[in-house]
Amino acid sequence: MKRTYQPNKRKRSKVHGFRSRMSTANGRKVLAARRRKGRKVLSA
């Protein structure tokens, strides 16, 4: 059985990237929450 995590840069940024987070209202909420918490990295 193959492992569940098969790294792929393009898919990673499409799903978890900054642009994809900015494209939806809830994604912007995620970024706001991470800024409020003081995360060094906001998105993938």
From Swiss-Prot:
Record region (Disordered): 1-44
Gene3D superfamilies (UniProt xref): 1.10.287.3980
PROSITE patterns: RIBOSOMAL_L34
Keyword terms: Ribonucleoprotein, Ribosomal protein
Keyword match Ribosomal protein: yes
GO terms for cellular component: ribonucleoprotein complex; ribosome
Molecular-function GO term, any one: structural constituent of ribosome
GO-annotated biological processes: translation
Lineage: superkingdom: Bacteria
Ranges annotated as biased composition (Basic residues): 1-19, 31-44
Family recorded in the similarity comment: Belongs to the bacterial ribosomal protein bL34 family.
Cross-referenced PANTHER family: LARGE RIBOSOMAL SUBUNIT PROTEIN BL34M, MITOCHONDRIAL RIBOSOMAL PROTEIN 34 FAMILY MEMBER
Name the UniProt record assigns to this protein: Large ribosomal subunit protein bL34
Organism: Bacillus cereus (strain ATCC 14579 / DSM 31 / CCUG 7414 / JCM 2152 / NBRC 15305 / NCIMB 9373 / NCTC 2599 / NRRL B-3711)
Gene name linked to the record: rpmH
